Amino acid sequence: MTRYDEIIMVVDALRRFAGIRRPGFAPRLGRGLLGLLGAGLLFSQTDPAGLARKALDMLLAQNYPQFAALASPQLKDNMNEQAFGKLGAEIKGWGAVEKIGDAVVEEMGPTRVVTIPVYFADRNIRARFAVNPAGQISVMYLMPGEAEWKRPAYSKPDLFTEQAVTFGEDEWKLPGTLAVPKGTGPFPAVLLVQDFGPIDRDDSHGVITKPFRDLSDGLASRGVVVLRYEKRLRQYSGRMTGKPYTADDETVDDAVAALGFLRTQAGVDPKQVYLVGHGLGGYLAPRIAGEDGKLAGLVLMAANERPLEDLMLDELLAAGIKGNDLVVAKAAVARIQGLEQNDADTPAILGLPAVYWLDLKGYNPAAEVKKLSIPILILYGERDFQVPKTDFDLWKSSLAGQKNVTARSYPALNHVFVAGTGPSTEQEYRKPGSHVAPEVVDDIAKFVGK
């Protein structure tokens, strides 16, 4: 899920907050979101991956009777035989099926959502299916597939190895990837902490831009151990959805656990462990450092200095809300700022639980930085349309005179530190070959002593 997706979800939440119904949505097939059919996300006790694969096979074979036998009544109402045939005709234009990838099953509230990559001669897609308790496909939609991630030029895979790891308490165990340089350690190590929302270990923005995978490869090639991991909001989305949670639950607690785990790994110098936080991860990095108490240094990438609600209002404006939606958004920000501790049961505001906002009430990342004596590097791409330059300037002014703090900006880089020209947009995140700029990898490597 990209930050844009999160904003659209928040806009919808604002409409509900104001009692406004969202108009019906029927996207064209063949552009952007290729098809959205059905409704009703519910939990299934059946084998969701097997059921979804069977539905996909029937779609590709254009066998409507057997497809309909797998579908919920709502899906059959939306996907009648005529619509099924039209979709099949469009799919036929994509050429022969060259490969069908493995199914990935996710918890999305009370549902199982199955994603299956399909590679055609002309394009690739992601087919997604939701399965309900009756063992029926209740939602089907086809999305543009991920272009294959290709290593940046600075990635030297012969210089490091990668291994799957798991860490954390039994209730919230998280999978991750540990990149370890070849040779004799001990090596400095970096923990990568992601941006806002249920984002993956690669900090993926769009379908092919994976800044943390770039950083991991680049730093490991330079002799740095790197740990990246799935966020709790992604790994346990079903358990988190609709329940009150805080910034500690979303990010801080797992980052502290990951740091403890990283220090125990073979080849790691436990006294040279650093944290690199992007977006929300950078905003919360000073809190994580305070909780951990052992970090050798911090890198804050595209981190907001202002309160989160102010940043979200800016992003909603950038997403184009106006009129009554804008009035409601501003009212929501005012409500957040007026929350008191006895308001913990207040319904979600701007898409986040009241306890989340209360947890951050009074949190000042620059003030927390001033409590730290460790080296801190603040990085900013001047083409960032998600975190305005206002925040970078505030970091510099708030921390002027702090000898342990270095701030650096890059005129050509965007929010994910990819180079470009002109105003940055969400479309940049979908551009093949988008990688974190080599100068950013170089600056971070030098910061950690490599």
For each feature predicted by the language model, list its residue ranges.
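Short, surface-exposed "cap/lid" segments of acyl-processing enzymes
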Residues: G183-G218
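Short beta-strand/loop motif that positions the catalytic acidic residue
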Residues: L372, I378-Y380
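Conserved alpha/beta-hydrolase
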Residues: D214-G238
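Alpha/beta-hydrolase active-site loop
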Residues: P244-A266
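Catalytic active-site module of serine/aspartate enzymes centered on a nucleophile-bearing elbow/loop
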Residues: V416, G422-K450
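Short solvent-exposed beta->alpha transition segments
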Residues: G50, K54-D57, A61-R112
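N-terminal cap/lid segment of alpha/beta-hydrolase-fold proteins
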Residues: A147-T184
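Accessory cap/linker subdomain of secreted extracellular hydrolases
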Residues: E291, G297-K371, G401
